[in-house]
């Protein structure tokens, strides 16, 4: 297993367009659901959530911004995967920008404030309540998990699976 992991780090793994579509679809599902679970757990323990409410505004258990962020992180850091510090720093900056402009856009365009970090843990270091130090550091760690655990696993599944089955299943999910 270690040799396969080192191969992931050291070699550019090439997939055809159809398989890449399947990889991106699976990545969107996994990271969007992960974001939903993370936010549920965080807000349950942080705010003592008394009743369950559906975060993310979807009819399925995922949050779009996590899925969008994962695609951006993949596109911006995959070639630098041998440099974890660079992956982390690029991820922190990228997710901070994504979160800031997503929050600002929803606030200004839709008139809806979906999050406000001004009162959160480590919220003192925030930008207009849309982004805070805690959130971007957590997203940086999640990005490391994405690049070094989730993507190698998805690539492994894509390589070992029948292409048609993998792509179809990924798209259906």
What are these regions (language model features)?
Residues 1-173:
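Aromatic-rich, lipid-facing transmembrane alpha helices and their immediate juxtamembrane interface loops
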């Amino acid at each position: 297993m270690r040799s396969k992991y080192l191969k992931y780090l050291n070699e550019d793994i090439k997939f055809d367009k159809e398989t890449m579509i399947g990889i991106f679809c699976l990545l969107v599902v996994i990271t969007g659901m992960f974001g939903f679970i993370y936010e549920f757990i965080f807000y349950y323990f942080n705010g003592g959530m008394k009743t369950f409410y559906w975060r993310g505004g979807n009819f399925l258990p995922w949050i779009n911004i996590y899925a969008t962020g994962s695609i951006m992180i993949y596109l911006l850091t995959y070639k630098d995967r041998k440099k974890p510090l660079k992956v982390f720093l690029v991820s922190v900056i990228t997710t901070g920008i994504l979160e800031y402009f997503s929050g600002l856009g929803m606030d200004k365009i839709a008139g809806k404030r979906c999050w406000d970090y001004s009162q959160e843990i480590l919220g003192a270091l925030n930008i207009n309540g849309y982004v805070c130090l805690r959130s971007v550091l957590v997203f940086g760690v999640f990005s490391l998990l994405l690049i070094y655990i989730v993507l190698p696993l998805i690539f492994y599944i894509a390589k070992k699976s029948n292409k048609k089955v993998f792509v179809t299943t990924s798209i259906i999910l």
